[in-house]
Swiss-Prot record:
It comes from the Bacteria. One of its GO terms (cellular component) is cytosolic small ribosomal subunit. One of the primary rRNA binding proteins, it binds directly to 16S rRNA where it helps nucleate assembly of the platform of the 30S subunit by binding and bridging several RNA helices of the 16S rRNA. Forms an intersubunit bridge (bridge B4) with the 23S rRNA of the 50S subunit in the ribosome. This is Small ribosomal subunit protein uS15. Keywords: Ribonucleoprotein, Ribosomal protein, RNA-binding, rRNA-binding. SUPFAM superfamilies: S15/NS1 RNA-binding domain. One of its GO terms (molecular function) is rRNA binding. Part of the 30S ribosomal subunit. Forms a bridge to the 50S subunit in the 70S ribosome, contacting the 23S rRNA. The gene is rpsO.
C-alpha cells in the first residue's frame, strides 16, 4: 500500500512546479510505485487473481500516460523513463 509519506516523497521528487500534483510525470511515478508494490505482493500471494487484474489495469493506465507524454514532449518522456528505469 502506498502510504501518504511515500506518496508525498514521490510527488516532491517528480513535480514540475511548487503546487504540481497531477502532471503526467507525477502520475506515472505514483503508478510505477504501486506496480512495484503489487509485483512484490504477488511473489508471496500467487493466487491473488483479483489484485492481479487491478495490476493489469494500473499498467495499462501508466502505458496510456506514457504514450500521451511521448506525443506531447519526447524529452520529458525520455527523462521519466530514465529516472524510473522503465523498459519501453
Amino acid at each position: 500500500m502506498l502510504v501518504t509519506d511515500k506518496k508525498q516523497e514521490i510527488i516532491t521528487s517528480f513535480k514540475r512546479h511548487d503546487s504540481d500534483t497531477g502532471s503526467p510525470e507525477v502520475q506515472i511515478a505514483i503508478l510505477t510505485e504501486r506496480i512495484i508494490y503489487l509485483t512484490e505482493h504477488f511473489k508471496v500471494h500467487k493466487k491473488d487473481h483479483h489484485s492481479r487484474r487491478g495490476l493489469l489495469k494500473i499498467v495499462g493506465q501508466r502505458r496510456r500516460l506514457l504514450d500521451y507524454l511521448k506525443k506531447k514532449d519526447v524529452e520529458r518522456y525520455r527523462a521519466i523513463i530514465e529516472k524510473l528505469g522503465i523498459r519501453r
